[in-house]
Amino acid sequence: MAALAAPGLLSVRILGLRTAQVQLRRVHQSVATEGPSPSPSPSLSSTQSAVSKAGAGAVVPKLSHLPRSRAEYVVTKLDDLINWARRSSLWPMTFGLACCAVEMMHMAAPRYDMDRFGVVFRASPRQADVMIVAGTLTNKMAPALRKVYDQMPEPRYVVSMGSCANGGGYYHYSYSVVRGCDRIVPVDIYVPGCPPTAEALLYGILQLQRKIKREQKLKIWYRR
């Protein structure tokens, strides 16, 4: 019975999605043609005026964020599934360069239990999808950093940990220090501090997961 009822439920969901799209289009058209709603007259009750104010200040989703067809709806759900798998299995590549690496080791210890977020540290860049640059990046180390980054499979992300990795830190004016690892590799998350605590790096990992959750790569590819 469940197998027979599944197609019916799917059709009801798709029809509900279509009606929601039609309603949103009508709301956008009415707002564009009629303009902002006039202020309520004094004769209206307080309840009606409150409802009209709430309707005027309501946030309507943009049409560009909604699926335009059944195929795009399927692509959107597939995008959500892929993003869930990626953010739930982040494998960082350890690239400790200075004292920030000690706090990175602290975060990887059993106290914070990073396994519950799917974070597993790998020693090989070919098995990692996240690079944590922890410490001062010198000019001699910059080519090695770029080479390791190029060996990581797509999609890959970079977390810049500490003031030295973010912008040079104490050694900003040194002749032998790169003033920010974002001059060598693209950075997704910046973790401030000198050195940042293990909790700060943990918060940066959580922010990276939120960023991955918002990605819409398949949807952008499909709309091309």
From Swiss-Prot:
Molecular function (Gene Ontology), one example: metal ion binding
User: What is the cofactor note?
Assistant: Binds 1 [4Fe-4S] cluster.
Its PTM note reads: Hydroxylated ar Arg-111 by NDUFAF5 early in the pathway of assembly of complex I, before the formation of the juncture between peripheral and membrane arms.
Among PROSITE patterns, the record links this protein to: COMPLEX1_20K
Start and end residues of each stretch annotated as Disordered = 28-50
The Enzyme Commission number assigned here is: 7.1.1.2
Entry annotated with the keyword DNA damage: no
Where do the annotations place [4Fe-4S] cluster binding?
C99, C100, C164, C194
Task: Provide a GO biological process annotation.
Answer: mitochondrial respiratory chain complex I assembly
Q: Which UniProt keywords apply?
A: 4Fe-4S, Electron transport, Iron, Iron-sulfur, Membrane, Metal-binding, Mitochondrion, Mitochondrion inner membrane, NAD, Oxidoreductase, Phosphoprotein, Respiratory chain, Transit peptide, Translocase, Transport, Ubiquinone
Q: Which NCBIfam families has this protein been placed in?
A: nuoB_fam, PRK06411.1
Oligomer and partners: Core subunit of respiratory chain NADH dehydrogenase (Complex I) which is composed of 45 different subunits. This is a component of the iron-sulfur (IP) fragment of the enzyme.
What family is this?
A: Belongs to the complex I 20 kDa subunit family.
Put simply, this protein is called: NADH dehydrogenase [ubiquinone] iron-sulfur protein 7, mitochondrial
- Please give the organism: Mus musculus (Mouse)
